[in-house]
Amino acid sequence: MSDNEKTTQPASTDSTEPAYRYNAALAQDIEGKWQKIWDDKGTFWAANVNGDLKDGKGRNADGRPAYFAMDMFPYPSGKGLHVGHPLGYLASDVVSRYHRMKGENVLHAMGYDAFGLPAEQYAVQTGQHPRVTTLANIANMSRQLHRMGLSFDDRRSFATIDPGYVRWTQWIFSRIYDSWYDEDAVNPSGSKGSARPVSELVAKFESGEKAIPGHESDGKAWADLDQAEQQDILNDFRLAYISKSPVNWCPGLGTVLANEEVTAEGKSERGNFPVFQRELRQWSMRITKYGHRLIEDLDGIDWPEKVKLMQRNWIGESHGASVHFTVDTADGSKDMEIYTTRPDTLFGTTFAVVSPEHHLLENVPAEWPADVPEDWKGGYATPVEAVKAYRLAAEAKTAKDRVDEGGEKTGLFTGLYATNPITGAKLPLFTADYVLMDYGTGAIMAVPGGDQRDYDFAVKFALPVIYTVKPLPESGDDLANYEGKAPFVSHDGIVINSSVEATAAKGDALSLNGLRVDDAIAKVNAWLESAGVGKGTVSYRLRDWLFSRQRYWGEPFPIVYGEDGTPHLLPDSALPINLPDVPDYEPRTFDPMDAESNPEAPLSRNEDWVKVELDLGDGKKTYYRDTNTMPNWAGSCWYYMRYLDPTDTKHMVEKDEFDYWMGPDHNKTAGKSGGVDLYIGGVEHAVLHLLYSRFWHKVLFDLGYVDSMEPFHKLFNQGMIQAYAYTDDRGQYVPAAEVVEGPADANGEPTFTWNGQHANREFGKMGKSLKNIITPDDMYENYGADTFRLYEMGMGPLAESRPWNTRNVVGSMRFLQRLWRNVIDETTGEVRVTDGELDTKTLKLLNNTIADVTVEMEAMRPNTAIAKLIVLNNHLTSLDAVPRAAVEPLILMLSPIAPHICEELWSKLGHTESLAHADWPKADERYVGQDSVTAVVQIKGKVRAKLEVSPDIDPKELEKMALEAVADRLGGKEPRKVIVKAPKIVSIVPAE
């Protein structure tokens, strides 16, 4: 029998067992009873400051300390939950119950992330409308979670597909769309840079305070521009804007994807389909404007360092310079801006490269310039033909293929030349697909003497190589080791070959020779700014967030377009914009390799919905709805705030409620950042949901809608529950529950068979495709929810992955049975505790357990808390009579982990109120600490003596006592080595 098969084996069902034994059947009765009581009495209702959301006793918050704990809410998939899913939910529930017992007003609720691709794909599989299947899945998942005994305030539950929720998601989009980022404005935290209403930008254009882009020289006023021209200019500033740029097009899914949804292999994260670069018109969000703040504010929140590092690396802040080169095109002189982290190497620039999508390629010459090498032309008769063909070839490649370091470097000459602003050199301008338009400016200056990729390209096309940095003298290295062989790649060294008598831009002399790299960068940046051809600047690896999808199952945009294509934001009174109920909601997908295919949004097929007659203030006109939908990340960007009051129809979140639950310093641990007190979820969301939520929150913070800088003050990443899976000799997965474990083989390893045939065991994830799923429903039926909770919380540290092994579940059941027997006579059902005084040993153990378990609960270490509670319970079992004064604190301490049995025992002990709000036990400090500990003395790893010593004994004193205790075994010789780990271990290595 395999480990997984044992999942279905219940606790004892022996009809001869005592009538009141705690078993699966009794556990189910107790759990059903208490879940109904909790529901009926509103035991876990959190009290708001104002309004109808009061606690179970009809009270508002009334100044009680607030604590807000939540989980990353689930996708309501058709598969339901397996036992790995609730790990985080159970952890947050334990924490929430503990904080209630500390007297805090705890907000703990659960909603459902119901839009997006998973729900749509499941609906496609079942042939039903996404709303029908999603609501059914929510009902099933809600049932499973409720049966687990999670202490949610169910009044606050919602799904992101609820019209009342969609309304506020669209409202937030509207605020972002109607905002721009003012670099000079001071945000509420006191630093520079803030989102401001677009109306303020318009006022700056109208007053002349800010120059109108594209009209600096023609003298046109803002009022002289027509509506379309004004909207085009504002579009370049809005935080939510329409862009026509290279995007990640996935034919296999029929939609575009954000960079974060594309794997390092250039495939879609969902479905593993190829992803291609296509220039399409899409919605984007200007998250890059918040790059520095998103990095800087990580210092003020309590997140795992690995997640902070992942966000810092993903944002990728780098300091360098923007430099303007002049390019003579068929349409006159054009500016080409590049970004470089090494402006000191401008003297070593021997060519330039632009992305195939770069706008300069619209103006290549009709004929090749004289004396162009044939291999620069790519075999084409003219630059126009060459560029057109190269662009088509680049479109057919994935982003990964284009930047793959190991791939062949392709490229061709454009027929254009760029002028170096310092040296005046005419640099041949190439196009190459390894330069991406959405990174930097889509143009690079190539320095083959200091960059391997540029060097390889220069060698391929026989371009000059100029070295501008040599090794530091103290390095022992020499430039001769590189010249003609390889680039010298270093961020430190001495600058060489970098001087000119008269610069092209200013005509002055400039020399960087002899300077260290950092000093040279500072000097050249100052020169660039003084010459008006560049400046020191900051760039980010982070790209603006691609925000539209060609899907049906998502939030519609609150945007319509006029006959001229100008976008118009719908008024808040028109929200929500609901999806039409249509029969044809499936996206049109294509051959996964069809890079030339074009997105076809499902909503575009519904003309009655798309074409509308509206009066937007200037009379009734015909408009056309945007047929894209928002990505599944939209609803999850702000859902934590809706828990504060999902019934509020007037506000996204009311200010008093926000300040109470999430404001800066709203409790002792919230800190300046404010936000949710505890947020539990998987590390896989580090650069997706968590980054997007922080961005939206900061925009709302800047605009004054929320008062905290961050959405989540403390983040905890739970580990993964893993399980065995089994395959037959063909490599196909077989049902784990049908696998039989046989005798060990010659190497002592267990053997397995399925249907009489050999089976192979492997260890990894739990999943439907692996046929090794164990569901909570199995556990409820065969052990009860409390045993399941206790086992899962006791498996190991929460942050670590751990193996599921059903044979160990019975150990958790036995612990609860022993606790039950300590209180209840299994034969009569009577309470068997006594009211006598505690003996000294019990008194000390109890108070030390209270002190230790409190520390473990504060640190979110329920596994070690359980271990200490087992020790206390075992001690009580050994007594002739179990004292009430010891078992009641034990029940209280166990209740966050196994609440149903503890409620039942608490009730049987005569208490009339639920223990959910009982006071957490406090240790009597007079009995905390140990009078002595046992120190083990080892010689060559074997225990040779044990000493009772003070817990704070001096290591030298312990060494002396240990040597005296084993002196006869050392034969009077001085030991070769003594290792003291006071107060518990002394290891001795004797002399030879």
Predicted regions and their residues:
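Amphipathic alpha-helical
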Residues: 35, 284-318, 359-412, 575-608, ...
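N-terminal catalytic cores of NTP/NDP-binding nucleotidyl/phosphoryl-transfer enzymes
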Residues: 52-134, 158-169, 338-341, 420-457, ...
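Catalytic alpha/beta core of large soluble enzyme barrels
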Residues: 92-93, 105, 362-471, 477, ...
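Alpha-helical recognition segments enriched in aromatics with Gly/Pro capping
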Residues: 150, 416-439, 468, 603-798
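Helix-rich, typically C-terminal accessory recognition domains appended to large enzymatic cores
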Residues: 113, 184-191, 236, 241-248, ...
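Basic, alpha-helical terminal appendages of large translation-related enzymes
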Residues: 1-62, 373, 464-475, 483-486, ...
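Conserved oxyanion/phosphate-binding beta-strand-loop segments in alpha/beta enzyme cores
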Residues: 2-10, 15-70, 100-109, 133-139, ...
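Residue patterns forming the tRNA-binding/recognition surfaces of aminoacyl-tRNA synthetases
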Residues: 2-27, 32-33, 37-41, 126-336, ...
